[in-house]
Amino acid sequence: MHGKKPSVQDIVLDLKPTTETDLTCYESLDNSEDEDETDSHLERQAEQAWYRIVTDCSRCQSTVCLTIESTHADLLVLEDLLMGALKIVCPNCSRRL
């Protein structure tokens, strides 16, 4: 722009880049197979957790404590079994069987 006000002659309609810019990324990634195995192992470990189950003996009604290591999904399956036909028996009652 020349002067205080823009004019039509100052506007350039035919614009072309002055230099060609290579936008290709030539970066290469390292082999990540080892990382994938490590990550999946940590995920499997994270899935497993310790749970303490406190319930009553189905015969004498005494308190029975169980500690299990399980995934949350498998814990829900066990919960369904305990709410159904599966019964827990205390050590004293199991000796009398």
From Swiss-Prot:
The keyword Transcription applies. It is found in: Host cytoplasm; Host nucleus. A zinc finger (unnamed) spans 57-93. It comes from the Viruses. GO terms for molecular function: DNA binding; DNA-binding transcription factor activity; protein domain specific binding; zinc ion binding. InterPro entries: Papilloma_E7. Belongs to the papillomaviridae E7 protein family. Homodimer. Homooligomer. Interacts with host RB1; this interaction induces dissociation of RB1-E2F1 complex thereby disrupting RB1 activity. Interacts with host EP300; this interaction represses EP300 transcriptional activity. Interacts with protein E2; this interaction inhibits E7 oncogenic activity. Interacts with host TMEM173/STING; this interaction impairs the ability of TMEM173/STING to sense cytosolic DNA and promote the production of type I interferon (IFN-alpha and IFN-beta). Plays a role in viral genome replication by driving entry of quiescent cells into the cell cycle. Stimulation of progression from G1 to S phase allows the virus to efficiently use the cellular DNA replicating machinery to achieve viral genome replication. E7 protein has both transforming and trans-activating activities. Induces the disassembly of the E2F1 transcription factor from RB1, with subsequent transcriptional activation of E2F1-regulated S-phase genes. Interferes with host histone deacetylation mediated by HDAC1 and HDAC2, leading to transcription activation. This is Protein E7. The gene is E7.
